[in-house]
Amino acid sequence: MGRYTLALLPLIVFGGIAHGAKMLYDQDFHGKNIAEIPSALSHQGADAEPAAARRATLPALTDAAIKGKLTLVNVFASWCLPCRDEHPVLKELAKDGRLNIVAINYKDQSDNALRFLGELGNPYQAIGIDPNGKAAIDWGVYGIPESYLVGADGTILYKRVGPSTNISLKEGLVPAMEKALGKPVS
């Protein structure tokens, strides 16, 4: 019996580590969803200009593209698999005329980003190119995809770390939009 237990020990240890990693991925030890960590810029003004340094052949992301309207800023890259997963959700969200959706293309080649958008569709009204990640640092990004809901005054109202899903929209982004708009979002 001791021989079999010893043989199963690595499997049991691996299972425990995998389960713990899954729990950490889903939530921290305080029961909070870590995908909704506040941005370092929360409730401060957001500056889009650094991402406009190099532009693709799409409308450029500037401060004017963000301020004055409720805007979702999505940080993505063509090489990011979770970005591909969330793309259909963003395309559907782009149909809501009350929300402006713009992007920061993170550490990517412009040609690759254009191919990505050509293949999957373009939900963005403007795109900033961030080849070295400086704009992402300015925004407080630490992994992509990330999305920021920015109020009409330029204040970050909500941050989503990881791919947006229908569930995350319902539980996080939509309530933040409703609060910003002062009315229910259908």
Curated annotation (Swiss-Prot):
SUPFAM superfamilies named in the record: Thioredoxin-like (SSF52833)
InterPro entries recorded: Periplasmic_diS_OxRdtase_DsbE, Redoxin, Thioredoxin-like_sf, Thioredoxin_CS, Thioredoxin_domain, Thioredoxin_ResA/DsbE_sf
A GO biological-process term: cytochrome complex assembly
Signal peptide positions (record): 1-20
Main location: periplasm
Known function: Required for disulfide bond formation in some periplasmic proteins. Also acts as a disulfide oxidoreductase in cytochromes c biogenesis. The cysteines of apocytochromes c must be in the reduced state for covalent linkage between the two moieties to occur.
Name assigned to this protein: Thiol:disulfide interchange protein CycY
Species: Rhizobium leguminosarum bv. viciae
Name of the encoding gene: cycY
